[in-house]
Amino acid sequence: SDTRVAENLNAKKIVSANGNIVMPGLINMHCHAADSLFRGLVENLPLEEWLGRVWIAEKAILTPETTYLGSVLGLAENLLSGSTTVMDMFWYPDETVKAAKDLGMRISTGGIFFDLPGIGGRSHENYVSGP
């Protein structure tokens, strides 16, 4: 094998990748990690009907803690599939960022904005104007 690439590197550990493919981590540009909590709840429906049912479930169980736990699950699944960076949008984005940090992932995230009341009854105007 050709080791010239690594001659001037100060690696703590050298791993032989002979016979394998080495590639950078993938980037998931559309992620709702904590939605992993609702997998299998509603399937094969048009988007509007699917959202209507999922939002009822979200309103019933989502808290900062359950969002964190769902994010850990969803982000771990991303890591296992090769994604090391995600762009996530979900309720309680601070909890999703904490989950990503705890797992060693890179993340970009933001809140949810639309013209319907969300978790906790907050409207778009409430989000724009601040806490």
Label each residue range with its predicted role.
Residues 16, 28-30, 85-87:
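Short N-terminal targeting/anchoring amphipathic segment
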Residues 1-23:
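Histidine-rich, glycine-flanked metal-binding segment
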Residues 39-105:
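Alpha-helical scaffold segments that flank or form the walls of functional sites
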